[in-house]
Structures are given as structure tokens and as C-alpha cells.
């Protein structure tokens, strides 16, 4: 990780305290401390040991050679929260941790409420970092549900209590998050608690939330210690979920760990296959990561993807409030195996590049294959994707679409897919806040990755695009990103400017 000077670290740390309150709103007060305090005196670099999978940015593709692009949706937001944790402390995250699609999908966009399970929309506008290119924004939204419409829940909390979890930004924060989630559930919802370290323990059998005191007492009793050798931890969690399966309900494992994924299945392929088998039986898996230094990001993402789930990185109280309170409906899938396919018109588009989604690209023939796994969309959740496109030299005033946007999804696992289709036209001279904000977030991600495709993107461009897109910001997360950028240290600003100049 890139070293930042002592004074820069202190300034950034002060911003961390002011921008993210660590005093819990949960009445139980399980978490008492500030994340930054766990690092003590300024250090040469953030804790080492985090593991990421390197990848190469998607390239431009000639429409004459391949006019069709297919990818699975990705509703995770872990990459953005991980970046925020590093940048707010004066450091840069590993570029392999920066996944632009997760930056985009951390935020909710102002998309129309769909009549059915999913709605789609799109627009085309100018590309801020290349005046000769256009940007195509794709949007999807899962149908919102009210509190009364939430499905009955059967949750299994699978908690890592190994010694590595014994720091303020790990187990205490996780306990506070789970206590907060319990307060949000309905009296007839069910919660189980399984822990693992040197051994596996079913600390709490499935219990209705009307007995919240019993559930909370079990959560408060959690303490960290011992090695991480999980035995049959994840298998036990799945068996617990199946034993209390609610037909037509939200059956889900919520796993909290610092990322050392030793849960009893040591072979990666065996683990992924097991998770897939249980996913096919209707058990979803939500991964929640905490802390740094032991972080196996690549495994966490793969497992959550195969488990029909979500992947979050929780670095502060505001983040667990986002995940378990403000966006709790996102834990209820309304669309399964959701795929997008874009077919470009070669008379209007010469080349295109999908920004992000590198590990979610699919073969074109997989789009119509209902046996192929893809991502889920939660209730009220929005998904955003961007293509940078190179227009042809001959542009026509004829009403010819730039592309056709097809989306396939299943309302329930095991059912046949439904398909939505939208022809994409565009007025290049106009844009919307949705497009400007998406462009700003993508440009920031490309700067952090020092992408060869960043063009003229720079920090001031990013701040201008985001700052002009704040009218729709119901929970203040867009403003939070702008505040982060405005409080970067001089060293961080200089580094971003150096990357922009290359």
C-alpha cells in the first residue's frame, strides 16, 4: 500500500472520526471504540496480508467483429467500502481491490419503480474523459417492498470468533451490527447463531425474534480467541437453515468474518460446489467482512457469488446501518440469475468497452441458458453499468437505436426466466444526474486503478461530476463520497494528479 506522511495520516484520521460515527445507535452498545484507534501510532503502511485477485480492465471491442456483450449483474458494494476505509486513513487501496461495478452499485440511483419484479432503463450522453466518445448507462431496479411485504425470514448468523477477530473493528463491530439487525426483524422471523474458531458451536438454535432477549444475550456473549479451524462450520450453517426452512420465505446465512475463510472445506472447488448446491435449494448467503490484515477478498467474492448472495465490507457503524437498516430489503431477492445482453448497431457504434464487471462477463450463448448462474437483485435495489462507446464516423439523423438492451431474470429460483427488451436511442447533447454521477464514480475508480482507459479524467473532474449530482441523495451517501474527496490529504491529491497526468 502506498505510504502517506505522518501529518497526512493524522489529518485523514481526524476526518474519519468526523465523517463516520463509531458510537453505536443500537441501544445495546456492543461496539465501543473508533476504528482508527486500533492502528495506534502512524504506521508505514496499512496492515499487510489482504488478498486480492488481479484482473485486467475490459478492452475496447470492435462492433464489426462482435456486436454483442453479455454480463451478469453484480449487486455487491464491498469494494467501495474497502476503498473508503483506506482513503479516509490516508492510504491508497490495492488497485486489484478496486472493482468499478461495486463502486457504482454501492449507491442507489433515481430509477423508475418497476411494475413487475424488475425494470430497466438506459441513456446515452457525452463521455467526460474523452470528447470523441459517448457513455451508455444501463439501469435496473428491483421492485420495492414495504415492511409489511417483507418475506418471513429464517436467518443463520455464522460468526468467526477466532483470535484474529479480537480488535475493535472486527468482532465488537460485528456484534453491534447483528444486534441492530435483530431490532429490525419481525417477531415471527427466526434467528440461529453458529460460531467457529478452534471448534464449531451452535450457540443458539433457531429462535423466533419475539424472544429477542435470548437472541441478543447469545450475541453479546461472543468473544474472540483461538485459531481459525472451522471444522464443519459452513456446512452446519446450511444444515441449520434447511432444518428451519420457510417455504416462500427468505432463507439466508449471514456470515461475519475478517476474511480468513477457514470454515471446514479447505478445497476451493469443493467449497464453491457445496455453496452452489445449497443455493439451488433456496439458501442464500450474505458475506460481511470486517477489518484488515487477514482479508481474502477473492474468496469472499467468489463464495458470495456462488451462494446467490451479497458481499459487504463493514468498516463503521454507518455502514452496518446502511446494510441492515436502510437497505435491509436488499437482503430479499426479487430477481435471480439476472443477466444483461447489449447488442450494438454497427452503423452507429464502432467500438465499445464495458467499464467494470470484469469477473462477471459471460459468454453470449449463456444469456438464453437458464442453467447458467448469474447475480441477484434485492427489493428496491438498483444496478448500474456503463459502456464507453466509440461512434462511427457517419452518424444518421434516422431513428436508429445505438443498441438493444435485453435482460433476463427469474422471479423465483428454479423457474424459467422472463425477458425485458429496450431499444436505446440518445440525445448526446443532454445528460442526467444519473449519468453524471455514474461517470464521476467510474472516473474515480479508473484513477484509483490507474487505468489505461482513464483518458483525461482527474480529481477535479470527478468532484465536479459528483458535486453536480446531489439532488437525489436520500441517505447522503453521494455527499459522503464528495466529502471524502474534499478531505483527501495533499499527498493523496498529488498522487491522484500524478496518475491523471500519465
Describe these PLM feature segments.
Residues 1-6:
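Positively charged n-region of N-terminal signal peptides that target proteins for export
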Residues 11-12:
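Repetitive helical segments and hydrophobic/amphipathic motifs
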Residues 16-19:
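C-terminal motif of bacterial Sec signal peptides marking the signal peptidase cleavage site
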Residues 21-27, 118-338, 392-397, 412, ...:
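Exposed acidic/Ser/Thr-rich ligand/metal-binding surfaces
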Residues 21-42:
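Low-complexity, Pro/Ser/Thr
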Residues 31-35, 96-102, 153, 215-217, ...:
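A broad, low-specificity signal for short, low-complexity segments enriched in glycine/proline
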Residues 35-75, 79-97, 111-122, 129-136, ...:
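An acidic, Ser/Thr-enriched
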Residues 102-112:
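Short, structured protein-protein interaction patches enriched in aromatics and acidic/basic residues
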Amino acid at each position: 500500500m502506498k505510504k502517506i506522511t505522518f501529518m497526512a495520516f493524522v489529518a485523514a484520521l481526524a476526518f474519519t472520526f468526523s465523517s463516520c460515527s463509531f458510537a453505536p445507535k443500537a441501544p445495546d452498545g456492543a461496539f465501543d471504540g473508533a476504528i482508527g484507534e486500533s492502528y495506534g501510532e502512524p504506521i508505514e503502511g496499512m496492515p499487510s496480508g489482504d488478498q486480492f485477485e488481479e484482473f485486467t480492465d475490459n478492452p475496447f471491442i470492435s462492433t464489426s467483429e462482435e456486436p454483442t456483450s453479455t454480463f451478469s449483474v453484480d449487486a455487491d458494494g464491498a469494494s467501495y467500502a474497502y476503498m473508503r476505509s483506506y482513503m479516509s486513513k490516508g492510504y491508497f487501496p490495492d488497485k486489484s481491490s478496486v472493482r468499478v461495478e461495486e463502486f457504482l452499485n454501492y449507491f442507489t440511483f433515481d430509477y423508475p419503480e418497476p411494475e413487475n419484479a424488475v425494470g430497466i432503463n438506459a441513456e446515452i450522453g457525452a463521455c467526460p474523459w474523452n470528447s470523441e466518445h459517448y457513455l451508455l448507462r444501463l439501469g435496473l431496479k428491483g421492485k420495492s417492498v414495504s415492511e409489511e411485504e417483507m418475506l418471513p425470514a429464517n436467518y443463520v448468523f455464522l460468526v468467526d470468533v477466532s483470535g484474529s477477530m479480537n480488535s475493535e473493528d472486527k468482532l465488537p463491530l460485528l456484534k453491534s451490527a447483528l444486534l441492530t439487525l435483530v431490532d429490525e426483524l419481525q417477531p415471527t422471523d427466526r434467528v440461529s447463531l453458529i460460531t467457529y474458531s478452534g471448534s464449531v458451536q451452535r450457540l443458539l438454535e433457531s429462535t423466533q425474534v419475539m424472544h429477542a432477549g435470548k437472541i441478543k444475550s447469545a450475541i453479546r456473549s461472543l468473544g474472540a480467541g483461538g485459531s481459525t479451524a472451522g471444522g464443519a462450520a459452513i456446512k452446519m450453517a446450511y444444515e441449520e437453515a434447511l432444518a428451519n426452512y420457510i417455504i416462500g420465505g427468505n432463507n439466508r446465512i449471514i456470515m461475519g468474518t475478517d476474511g480468513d475463510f477457514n470454515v471446514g472445506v479447505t478445497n476451493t472447488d469443493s467449497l464453491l460446489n457445496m455453496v452452489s448446491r445449497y443455493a439451488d435449494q433456496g439458501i442464500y448467503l450474505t458475506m460481511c467482512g470486517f477489518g484488515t490484515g487477514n482479508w481474502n477478498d477473492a474468496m469472499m467474492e467468489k463464495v458470495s457469488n456462488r451462494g446467490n448472495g451479497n458481499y459487504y465490507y463493514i468498516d463503521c457503524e454507518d455502514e452496518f446501518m446502511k446494510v441492515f437498516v436502510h437497505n435491509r430489503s436488499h437482503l430479499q431477492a426479487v430477481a435471480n440469475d439476472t443477466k444483461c445482453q447489449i447488442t450494438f448497431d454497427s452503423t452507429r457504434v464502432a467500438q465499445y468497452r464495458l467499464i467494470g464487471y470484469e469477473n462477471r462477463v459471460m459468454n453470449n450463448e449463456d444469456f438464453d441458458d437458464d442453467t447458467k448462474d448469474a447475480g441477484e437483485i434485492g427489493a428496491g435495489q438498483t444496478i448500474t453499468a456503463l459502456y464507453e462507446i466509440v461512434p462511427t464516423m457517419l452518424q444518421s439523423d434516422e431513428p436508429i437505436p445505438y443498441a438493444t438492451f435485453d435482460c433476463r431474470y427469474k422471479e423465483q429460483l428454479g423457474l424459467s426466466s422472463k425477458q425485458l427488451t429496450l431499444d436505446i436511442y440518445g440525445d448526446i447533447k443532454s445528460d442526467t444526474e444519473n449519468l453524471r454521477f455514474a461517470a464521476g464514480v467510474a472516473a474515480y475508480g479508473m484513477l484509483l486503478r490507474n487505468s489505461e482507459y482513464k483518458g483525461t479524467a482527474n480529481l477535479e473532474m470527478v468532484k465536479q461530476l459528483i458535486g453536480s449530482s446531489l439532488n437525489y441523495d436520500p441517505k447522503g451517501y453521494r455527499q459522503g463520497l464528495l466529502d471524502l474527496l474534499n478531505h483527501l490529504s495533499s499527498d493523496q491529491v498529488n498522487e491522484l494528479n500524478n496518475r491523471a497526468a500519465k
